Amino acid sequence: MSDTVCLKRSEWFVETFFPGIRRCKLDAFRIDKEIFKGKSKYQDIHVFESRGFGRILALDGIIQFSQSDEFIYHEVIAHIPLMTHPHPRRFLVVGGGDGGVLREAVKHPLKELYQVEIDQEVVGICKKYFPFVSGGAFLDKRLRVCFEDGKNFINKYKNFFEVIVVDSTDPVGPGKALFQGGFYTSVFNALTNDGIAIFQLGPFIDFGLIIKSIAKKLKAHARFVCPVRLPMPSYSCGSEYCFMLASKKIDPAKLTPGILGQRLALRLKHKANSLKYYSPQIHQASLVMPKIWRV
């Protein structure tokens, strides 16, 4: 006897990044519990729980993170650039309204942290329904949060930040402007001479369509540009997801696990015990690419 059960479409969340088109696997999550469904000034917001993934946030029909694997995304995008820089003092995250990047960044002995987020309602929703993601980071006294367009904000700064994390949504809706050439120019103008930036890009299946072209744009500003690999089981890519690391002066490939381990112990001390995914070995392995994905 078959265990297959036919369910109503209303009981499922089906991700539709490209309407009517699926280049990756079909992502359908059973909605076991509706938490919140609404619309901000900028985007649709959906919070629900799904068996095996826990609580999930979707914006404009696209999964942003799930409770089961958000730590992978946030630890990689925060610690890889911060650990690559020898003396980071000022840190900026563009986007990241859920607070996950900040949760990881505040573990470092930074002098100042900044966040610019266009959608204040997303921050409020995440504080209410996903307090475990920010982990109290919004209360850090070193942090300044600004609600405005990321490009407008970053244009105010020159040679100021050692590390910038661009944790934007995908290249649709409010995040579209953060995938254009003018924005990249602004990012590198805001970085110090030895500054490092990392950008959320997408699945490696988009390598030829998106990732390779963005790497070319970044090479106009940074001496070292390299993809960063990470697994994201809750994303439509299935597993292989891509960030892009861009460094003006420091070669990320020359950092050994020994050097990274020393920095980790010195900077995070006992806080390193809270890490679930990042390690010096993971750091180094995340930069290793097959030939087809090298830029």
Residue ranges of predicted features:
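A general beta-strand register signal
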Residues: 58-59
